[in-house]
């Protein structure tokens, strides 16, 4: 399963991403409430339908704040250039068996690859 970051969704809505369409069709896409929340803060066409569709996807395991703080310490993420929500997404992937994070955020991708948690799709 692939946890899709907001950067992938935004690019998909700008110009259809066939890789994402294939993953959705195969039932391989995970959502996360923080990604849905970030997207909800944007200007969405067909807002309610989009948010409902995201909420209807299988959801990644949500890490507690304590789990994320431990994850940050255990993986030396301080000073890595990622944000707290990014750390939450990586922790969620770690907690969701068989999942990977798909992002176009360069720093998040680099950390995800280092930790073996990133989906390295060819862009």
Feature map (PLM): residue ranges:
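Active-site neighborhoods of divalent-metal-dependent phosphate/nucleic-acid chemistry enzymes
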Residues: 12, 18, 59-123
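Short, histidine-centered active-site or binding-site loop motifs used for metal coordination
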Residues: 34-35, 72
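Short, well-structured N-terminal submotif of metal-dependent ribonuclease cores
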Residues: 1-34, 40-52, 58, 117-118, ...
């Amino acid at each position: 399963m692939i946890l899709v970051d907001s950067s992938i969704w935004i690019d998909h809505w700008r110009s259809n991403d066939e890789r994402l369409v294939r993953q959705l069709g195969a039932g391989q896409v995970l959502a996360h409430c923080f990604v849905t929340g970030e997207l909800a803060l944007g200007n969405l066409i067909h807002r309610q339908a989009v948010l409902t569709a995201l909420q209807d996807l299988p959801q990644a395991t949500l890490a507690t704040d304590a789990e994320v703080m431990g994850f940050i310490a255990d993986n030396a993420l301080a000073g890595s250039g990622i944000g707290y929500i990014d750390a939450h997404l990586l922790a969620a992937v770690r907690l969701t068996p068989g999942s990977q994070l798909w992002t176009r955020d360069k720093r998040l991708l680099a950390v995800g690859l280092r930790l073996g948690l990133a989906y390295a799709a060819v862009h």
